[in-house]
């Protein structure tokens, strides 16, 4: 696959997702980093987004709840280049009915090469990165070339 460059803006579009057993962990992380997160555009799956808004008064673009299609909505935003960072505290010890959606979301984040945190330690590394508030170039698939090759 040919690659091209995408510039993540200084003001990031950040998706926040958490499974039920991890919501409190994400809430604590968000509250701890609220001054930094307020400088960015936030998205979240439905329940998580509403909980964050209620607890912090931050503006969060809430999708549907994860099991109702919210994970897929976030994945679509990633594939459209509208999400720059994914913070996804998923529960590795409990299966969820929408496991295929979870796998698809993580796959899309990997395909489009955006930073992903699946636990507090990694989320802390990302938000404390010297690049977090800077524009950063990343390599992504060159979809136009991909499509042109497929249509030959």
From Swiss-Prot:
Residue intervals of the MGS-like domain: 6-152
Reactions mediated catalytically: dihydroxyacetone phosphate = methylglyoxal + phosphate
An annotated GO cellular component: cytosol
Active-site residues, record numbering mapped to chain: 71
Top-level taxon in the UniProt lineage: Bacteria
Molecular functions per Gene Ontology: methylglyoxal synthase activity
Assigned keywords, A-Z: Lyase
Alphabetical list of PROSITE patterns matching this protein: METHYLGLYOXAL_SYNTH (PS01335), MGS (PS51855)
Top-level EC class: lyase
Binding site residues for substrate: 19, 23, 45-48, 65-66, 98
One Pfam family this sequence matches: MGS
Keyword Ligase found: no
One of the GO biological process terms: methylglyoxal biosynthetic process
The EC number(s) this enzyme carries: 4.2.3.3
Job of this protein: Catalyzes the formation of methylglyoxal from dihydroxyacetone phosphate.
Stored HAMAP family: Methylglyoxal_synth
Similarity field: Belongs to the methylglyoxal synthase family.
Record-linked NCBIfam families: MGSA, PRK05234.1
This protein's name: Methylglyoxal synthase
Organism: Escherichia coli O17:K52:H18 (strain UMN026 / ExPEC)
Lineage: Bacteria, Pseudomonadati, Pseudomonadota, Gammaproteobacteria, Enterobacterales
Gene name, Swiss-Prot/TrEMBL: mgsA
């Amino acid at each position: 696959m040919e690659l091209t460059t995408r510039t993540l803006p200084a003001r990031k579009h950040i998706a926040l997702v958490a499974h039920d057993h991890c919501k409190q962990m994400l809430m604590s992380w968000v509250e701890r980093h609220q001054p930094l997160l307020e400088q960015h555009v936030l998205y979240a799956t439905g329940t998580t987004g509403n909980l964050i808004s209620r607890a912090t008064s931050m503006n969060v673009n809430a999708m549907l709840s994860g099991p109702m299609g919210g994970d897929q909505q976030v994945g679509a935003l990633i594939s459209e280049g509208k999400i720059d960072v994914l913070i996804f505290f998923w529960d590795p010890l409990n299966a969820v009915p929408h496991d295929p959606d979870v796998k698809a979301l993580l796959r899309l984040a990997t395909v489009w090469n955006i930073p992903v945190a699946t636990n507090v330690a990694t989320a802390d590394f990302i938000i404390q990165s010297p690049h977090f508030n800077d524009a950063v170039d990343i390599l992504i698939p060159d979809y136009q070339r991909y499509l042109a090759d497929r249509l030959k």
